[in-house]
């Protein structure tokens, strides 16, 4: 079997189809959503779909350009040779070694598509090819409740807003939630970098603690609470905040500072509570120092930007040696969601699955053929062959596309 053609696409979601209820364009939450995907075709009629994890922020055009360069390198190769292709991307791209998000997101998209083809070729879900599912359902948490929950995006400004969003998720059966308490002031204005970093003013620390304390009291002691930092604080301010909130039984503290192994260890050692990070850490080489210095207890590789399924499995195996858990970062289309569910069903050190608020958006749902939803805070593992999802006809006809043959 040979790769004959590759389509690289920047999708154009119907962002008028928000489902209603969007009360604020928080960091252009809806407006700047543009998934980057690929479809790899073969001479046997099989094809595979993959996603590059650059859904928000900057870098979409750069990622698509990187994918076009990579595509030329693998035309004519056997799509079942995912390890050979991965190393070709990494070693023969020259500047690709020790790369960043654009390079690894591009590799991830192709790797995902190759595994999709492999699953279809053997007529099994990729979980079977990864070694078999240890679990048929996955506990998940409601993620990013500062935006709101469900179709009604009601961003939290006042302390009661955080409480209301948390209780809404808990009422739907979730026994774990994640919230960023750090970003917005009481009036909805964003805190500046100077206000979030360095030695903090009492007002900021008091406000964060007030919000965390209120949510913990509302949800009770049996619901796990993940505190999301988004690296908006630095190591110094993260420790100040962490000292105030750790008494509220934090499940783990995510991205408390810019990802660097030494500063992450400084925060971990100072606070003595579980730490998570990973959506901006790429490849086993970048994860290795965090694993070796034990500064993270939960690694969060994104299968659409860490280097793909091939690389994520290696990262998980490395972490397993050190009793470090895995929670895949998931913020994309159903391609990434289904892939993560397959992957997390296999690994022994799975912690919990992330169910991101973006996956409620109708414009995201119409990009793929499958729409996976949890029931009472648990996802069923996909049974469809391949990664378990494909691009929809809408996606294929609403995109900017480059074809490489």
Predicted regions and their residues:
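Structured beta-strand/loop patches that form or line metal/cofactor-binding pockets in enzymes
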Residues: 1-49, 53-55, 358-365
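Conserved, mostly hydrophobic/aromatic
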Residues: 3, 45, 70, 110, ...
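Ligand-binding pocket scaffold of soluble enzyme catalytic domains
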Residues: 38, 43-44, 49, 81, ...
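Metal- or metallocofactor-binding catalytic centers and their adjacent structured scaffolds
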Residues: 41-121
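Short beta-strand/loop segments at the ligand-binding rim of alpha/beta enzyme cores
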Residues: 133, 139, 219-228, 268-278, ...
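Shared catalytic-loop signature of beta/alpha-barrel
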Residues: 243-252, 258-378, 382
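Extended hydrophobic packing segments that form well-structured cores
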Residues: 386-405
């Amino acid at each position: 079997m040979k790769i004959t053609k590759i389509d690289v696409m920047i999708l154009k979601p119907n962002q008028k189809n928000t489902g209603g209820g969007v009360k604020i364009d928080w960091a252009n939450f809806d407006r700047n959503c543009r998934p980057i995907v690929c479809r790899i075709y073969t001479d046997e009629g099989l094809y595979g779909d993959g996603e590059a994890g650059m859904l928000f922020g900057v870098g979409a055009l750069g990622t698509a350009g990187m994918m076009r360069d990579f595509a030329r390198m693998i035309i004519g190769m056997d799509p079942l040779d995912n390890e050979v292709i991965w190393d070709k991307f990494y070693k023969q791209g020259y500047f690709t070694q020790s790369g960043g998000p654009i390079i690894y997101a591009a590799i991830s998209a192709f790797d995902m598509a190759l595994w999709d083809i492999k699953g279809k070729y053997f007529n099994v879900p990729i979980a079977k090819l990864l070694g078999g599912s240890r679990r048929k359902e996955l506990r998940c948490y409601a993620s990013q409740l500062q935006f709101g929950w469900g179709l009604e995006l009601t961003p939290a400004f006042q302390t009661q807003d955080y409480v209301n969003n948390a209780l809404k998720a808990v009422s739907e059966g979730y026994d774990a939630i994640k919230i960023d308490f750090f970003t917005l002031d009481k009036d909805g204005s964003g805190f500046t970098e100077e206000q979030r970093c360095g030695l903090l003013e009492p007002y900021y620390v008091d406000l964060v603690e007030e919000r965390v304390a209120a949510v913990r009291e509302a949800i009770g002691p049996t619901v796990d609470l993940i505190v999301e930092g988004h690296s908006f604080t630095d190591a110094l301010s993260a420790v100040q905040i962490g000292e105030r909130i750790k008494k509220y039984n934090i499940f783990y503290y995510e991205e408390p500072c810019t990802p660097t192994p030494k500063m992450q260890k400084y925060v971990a050692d100072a606070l003595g509570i579980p730490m998570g990070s990973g959506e901006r850490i790429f490849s086993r080489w970048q994860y290795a120092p965090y694993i070796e210095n034990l500064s993270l207890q939960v690694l969060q590789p994104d299968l659409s930007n860490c280097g793909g399924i091939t690389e994520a499995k290696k990262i998980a195996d490395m972490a397993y040696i050190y009793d470090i858990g895995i929670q895949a970062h998931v913020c994309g289309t159903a391609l990434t969601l289904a892939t993560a569910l397959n992957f997390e069903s296999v690994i022994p050190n799975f912690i919990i699955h992330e169910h991101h608020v973006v996956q409620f958006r109708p414009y995201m749902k119409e990009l793929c053929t499958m729409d996976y939803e949890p029931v009472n805070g648990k996802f069923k593992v996909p049974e469809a062959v391949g990664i378990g999802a494909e691009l929809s006809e809408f996606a294929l006809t609403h995109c900017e596309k480059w074809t490489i043959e």
